[in-house]
Amino acid sequence: MDEKKQQNITIKGTKDGLTLHLDDCCSFTELLQELDEKLSTHYYDGDGRSLIEVHVKVGNRYLTEVQQEEIRTLIRNKKNLVVDSIESDVITKAEAIAWKEETEIVPISKIVRSGQVLHVKGNLLLIGDVNPGGMVIAGGNIFVVGSLRGIAHAGYYGDKDAVIAASVMNPMQLRISDVTTRAPEEKEDGAETAECAYINEDNHIVVDRLQLLTHLRPNLTKLERGIV
């Protein structure tokens, strides 16, 4: 008895249109052939004029731009169908490198002096001081094992969950994402303790004791392992 032919494509109708789940193990040629057959034999009710959005999910298959365009063209040639998105669970090497740069902890040991700017894409672990007039910028969080007396800008690319922490927090200015705060007032007792800065629910930057950080940002425990 012949085995039932493996179905490489599943079509599901949703309120947003159609979702096509494409198998990620068969050959691309086989995939296109079955896609053409299935879209030719299925008739989708409509007024004959409205376009139906198609969302394509290809799983763990990497598609080149040429292959993506082949899929778009095939679907576009069917009645009233237009591709809204093609989603893959696979990322390119360039995307992986960019993600690594944005999420890794970059340890740097130096003093950032007046007029100097230190900028990293990911999380910054600075072992040293930021002098008045110096500036540190990070796409993620900023950790200063030393004195922060200059300007610090965390979440540079828009991450409002980013934080700034320093052994001695006495900055000229703090920035997190697009939120800015002026230098906090000098402590009356002159005490210099480790503190952190974060954006609260009112979209204001708050400076508080460092011990609160694990409660405010539980995910930072993963970064702590990277630091250790």
Curated annotation (Swiss-Prot):
One Gene Ontology term from the biological process aspect of the record: cell morphogenesis
Source domain of life: Bacteria
Keywords linked to the UniProt accession: Cell cycle, Cell division, Septation
HAMAP family linked: MinC
Binding partners and assembly: Interacts with MinD and FtsZ.
Role played: Cell division inhibitor that blocks the formation of polar Z ring septums. Rapidly oscillates between the poles of the cell to destabilize FtsZ filaments that have formed before they mature into polar Z rings. Prevents FtsZ polymerization.
Membership in a protein family: Belongs to the MinC family.
Designated name of the protein: Probable septum site-determining protein MinC
Taxonomic source organism: Bacillus cytotoxicus (strain DSM 22905 / CIP 110041 / 391-98 / NVH 391-98)
